[in-house]
Amino acid sequence: MKIKRTITSLLTAAMLATALAGCQNTSEASKVQSANDEQNSQATVTETTAPPDPYSDIDDMISKMTVEEKVGQLFYVNCRGNDMSDAINKYHIGGVLLFGVDFDGKTKEKVNADIKAMQSNAKIPLIIGTDEEGGTVVRASDNPKLRESAYLSPSETFANGGWSAVEDDAYDKAEFLLSLGVNVNMAPVCDITSDSNSFMYYRSFSSDAASTSRFVDTVVKASKEKKLGTVLKHFPGYGDNGDTHYSDATDSRTFSELQNNDFLPFQAGIAAGADSILVSHITVNSIDSENPASLSEPVHKVIRDTLKFDGVVMTDDLDMFAVDALDIYEPLSVVAFKAGNDFLCCGDIESEYTALLNAVQSGEITADRIDESVKRILIWKRNLAIL
């Protein structure tokens, strides 16, 4: 009987211990499950809560714009000494490109007053740009009333003082242009050429992709720090090919050659935070043998999909020979916009604006496509602290 009671007691104790362990395990499992549920709940909240849109106010602004105002923002109009008040008021243009004649013989005060008058006529602040590359292309600095001497070419600047001189030059240009009221420099030149007979030879920094890339990176970063807009030009790179100002030009290099050489300075500029890319009028057979780059949808797909650039893409001047002389049935502004450009550089604003507006109103170009480009342009203006 004593043995039996002992065994019974042992069995009872074992069963009690098992029950208690089971309760403890259940309690621990409940805690783990509760923690998992809380984590899942937090994860669900994280996944479903979208970050705030930093440009929601720009979307709101676009929603209140008329179609005429939206179309106008897509145009970057050559000034060339003309009175721009009508273009600004009537066509709601997005920007004005100044040439040498717009600075020649003028004091800083006069240039400031001219640009201030343009801005006062604009409902939305204007991009005011000019080409101040240095060397053979200077618009403002060769006026002794504005600067003691014109800027040297970037390659000369480097030869005189190395990379620190290039950086100092970029800072100085930014301060100089901003002091005049200019907010965008149509630079840096990203083209690489080794042919001394090429029209780009004295404008390009180097025949070496790595050096040119470092130059572009330096200029973009310095300009960005000062809030001067930059434009990477002339995509996809002229190389040693002809001048599209006066004739058509064709590039027969392979896509791989372009990727491994000419694209590199553009990629450096994009990584540095460049605002815009200008597309040239050269025909690049390896991408699109039928159309100049500026009017080519495949070329613009390379910019967006291969280079991953989401800033403003602009045309080179649509008045240049290589596109102006084309035998096409559609207005250049419509063709260029359909190809993927956001900002259309031209002189004949009346006809090009009217053609693009008609294409939008007829449904040939969608409202969403217009809004997409207008948003890029307004974001650019916001980043330059003019909007």
Could you say what each language-model-derived stretch is?
Residues 66, 96, 104-118, 126, ...:
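Second-shell residues forming the walls of enzyme active-site clefts
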Residues 79-83, 130-143, 183-193, 232-238:
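Short glycine-enriched loops at secondary-structure junctions
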Residues 1-11:
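Bacterial N-terminal signal peptides that target proteins for export
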Residues 24-26:
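Bacterial signal peptide processing site
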Residues 35-128, 132-142:
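N-terminal hydrophobic targeting/anchoring segments and the immediately downstream early-domain regions
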Residues 78-90, 165-176, 259-268, 327-335:
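Short, acidic/polar
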Residues 150-220:
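A substrate-binding/cap region within the structured catalytic cores of diverse enzymes
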Residues 18-22:
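C-terminal motif of bacterial Sec signal peptides marking the signal peptidase cleavage site
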